Amino acid sequence: MSSSNFNEMNELNMTQTNYGSTKYTAQHHQGVINAIISSLTAPDQPTTVSLQYSNDKNMATEIQAYAKLSGPNWTYYVKDLEVSIGRNTDPLNSALQENSDGVKNSYRVNIDLGPAKVVSRKHAIIKYNMNIGGWELHILGRNGAKVNFQRTHNGPNNPPIRLSSGTLLDIGGTQMMFILPDSDPVVAPICIEHLMPNLINMFGLEGNNNPLLRDIIKQSNYAKQRQLTSNQQIKGFKLYGSGGNAPFGSGANLGPSEQGIFNNNNNSKNKNGYFTSINPNYTASTTTSNTINPQAASPQGPPNTIIAANFVDSYKSSNAYPQALDFTSDLSHDENRNVKPPHSYATMITQAILSSPEGVISLADIYKYISSNYAYYRFAKSGWQNSIRHNLSLNKAFEKVPRRPNEPGKGMKWRISESYQQEFLNKWNTGKVGKIRRGSSVARQLQLHMAKFNSLPMEMDYRLSLNMAQPPKRQLQSHNVLEPSNNNIIEGFVQHVPSKGNLPASQQSQPPVSHQNQSQQPPPQEQRQEIQFTFADTQNRNIALARPIKTPQLQAPNSNANLNQNNMKEYKESLHPPAISISQMNRQSPNNALVSFTNACANSKIINNISDSADKSTNNNGGTKMNLPAISTSSLDENGNLEPTTTTSSGNSNSVPQTGTTTSSLAANSLRLSQPYDTLLRSPTKAFHITAMEAYTPERGSANRARSPLHSNSNNTNNNGANNSNLQTSGMENKQTGLVLDSNVLKSMESNNDNRRLTPSTSKSQNVKSSPGVWNLLQFSSTNNTPAADSGGNKRGFSINPDIKAKENENATSEKDSDSNSNDLETKDINSSPLKNQGGSTANAKELILDTDGAKISIINN
């Protein structure tokens, strides 16, 4: 509920309010509270709580409880910090069920509002909030509830509703008041206005000789309106003539009442611009009709009728219009099945609702009313019924109400909203209802109904007739409840609600509890004994009333904040060590393509050793991290021979994978090419040798070949961007495919000594992938996918330049200790497929010949 409603509750302070010069005692306030509780409504069928906690059974004068919920004839004392409200499905005297441990389980709610099924099994919970020091209402049922006659939101996701002493609750048609022992109940003025018809019907305008109740009734808007009705000061707007079916006819067609309105010399125009007509021959009557039967309405108009002056002029002068039809009667005949009524759906819905004496009607009855009064909809298709449902749901003037308990049928009923009705009555009483703008069809129908009957069926509550069914018992109960000797109701009616959760000043000034003390709080059962209070006799003033202790909610001190920050800083530093420059690792690389390639393969072990730190290091140039694919390269063993080394990607998209890099990526900082040497970038067209282990590369055919660490290099100042991109992509292709150049080609390159680097790939191969079936054949050539072992020094029988082998030995010996995988392969003789087992003599060894241009593989004997 919004905060404005709570502010409105604080406006009515009966303890400090004097009506006239009369002083009110505590007994007067208690009598008003008892009168309000006795005027609360209840379902037709007695609820279980009214039978279980009837006031006849509460004979004790002193009961220890935290709070109480009072209904019209029952009282429930809250003795726990949490109370459930709902409907029990098992009988009241049924035995409790026992679980496997022998402990009795009770799924019963504390306050049973059954047997009406409009109440959910677990509809609401009232619990005490230790943090704020107050009681809260949690609504769980699908049909919701009303707090101080204002509908609230339901569901576990909605915030709870703060309760104060004097709050009125309406759950499933059962109204009750929440009362605290240490504060006088505060009843909102809007609640008194809603209950005023019941109060007047039960206690009359004199308020059962209670001066406070009498003054409250006299100051209410409902009593003032009823007094005007008793004096027959009826305000009406004659929109349609009641005689001759001629509202726009001449004066000869007017009835006696209408002629008296326009021809009477007693007509006068008041200050609001309305004509007032007084018929002296009219005999006052104190009875009013509560039905909307057109035949029951008298053809004679009311004696006092106030209509707009401009409407009178148009009424008298417009005699040229044809006679209007009485649509409510004529269009019901079958011969008018093709005549569509000139009414909106909201108008017909309002007519159907007003046709009920209680102002409440079901959806089926709305259909029945429209089809009975309008032949067009009786013979039309059922599409108009969907429009009726949409208007009921979307129009704020209509609201749903539950059925009575055990009432036949299903579904909710409909009525005109109470707020809309109250707004209309306020305009009606102030004379502003004539300013109805276009489209307000509901207000126009209410205006017509008030003009004929001077009352609305919604002015009575939906269940008021049920309460009035037993007037002697209710009257006797009201007299008994107003006696000062009643000990079940606490004294006082209105006390101003404190702004801080209804807490006394002593509790509001409490110092905050420390964190250590808060952690050592007693269990709720012990605290429950400390904060209990006593509902005592009004004569006994010496009994102390305690209130639940407010426990402030403290936040845990952030004493470990600096320590946590230091730990996090050290953890981040461990994850991000200083980056190692690639150019420093490759500082001694000579300017030769193959030597750079083999050195890069050897240096892959260095990179792999520092991969735990380098994979999370940031780029010094741009500060950004690059996503690089996993690369499989060949490294050198201690003898300088090529040995395959396979690495995989770490899977982290923000880190550098643990790979060995090739020539193009390591030596690209000082690499510059020009257009005339583009032909040297192409690989030889002759077939080159590839072994089984070289072919077994899981990354072969990867789509990430165009990605390279060279993308973040800012030192390359070559203006020819095409050559740079060509170099990067070709170098990456070399990485992925693991191509090995022929030794004869490399020797011819060294003899020329033209200081040009060669990347063994072609521009044609950059965009053309080899057949996937070829690589699958090579990858799965071995059953266990294990590398072949050699007993000799040269494990693969490659013809490598001695100078190159010497330079490779220098780099390979520095990583001898860290290369455990190479040592394992040297000491093991793995018997796998014939393609991998190439040890011993190479005379009978078979090699694979791969032609990249023709995508062919052939096996030859050495």
UniProtKB/Swiss-Prot annotation:
Limits of the FHA domain = 83-152
Q: Does the keyword Transcription apply?
A: yes
* Record has Transcription regulation as a keyword: yes
Comp. bias intervals (Polar residues): 611-644, 750-770, 778-788, 830-844
Drop me one GO molecular function for this one.
chromatin binding
Quick one: where is this thing mainly located? nucleus
Q: Which domain of life is it from?
A: Eukaryota
Q: Where does this polypeptide localize?
A: Nucleus; Cytoplasm, Cytosol
Task: Show the segment(s) annotated as Disordered.
Answer: 498-528, 611-663, 698-730, 750-846
- Compositional bias, Basic and acidic residues, is annotated for 804-829
- Biased-composition ranges, Low complexity, are 504-520, 645-655, 712-726
Q: Which GO terms describe its cellular component?
A: cytosol; nucleus
Q: Which PROSITE patterns match?
A: FHA_DOMAIN, FORK_HEAD_1, FORK_HEAD_2, FORK_HEAD_3
- Record's subunit section: Interacts with MCM1. Interacts with NDD1. Interacts with the origin recognition complex (ORC) composed of ORC1 to ORC6.
Describe its function. Transcription factor that regulates the expression of the CLB2 cluster of genes during the G2/M phase of the mitotic cell cycle. The CLB2 cluster of genes includes mitotic regulators such as CLB1, CLB2, CDC5 and CDC20 as well as SWI5 and ACE2, transcription factors required for the subsequent temporal wave of cell cycle regulated gene expression in the M/G1 phase interval. Involved in HMRa silencing.
**Protein name according to UniProt:** Fork head protein homolog 2
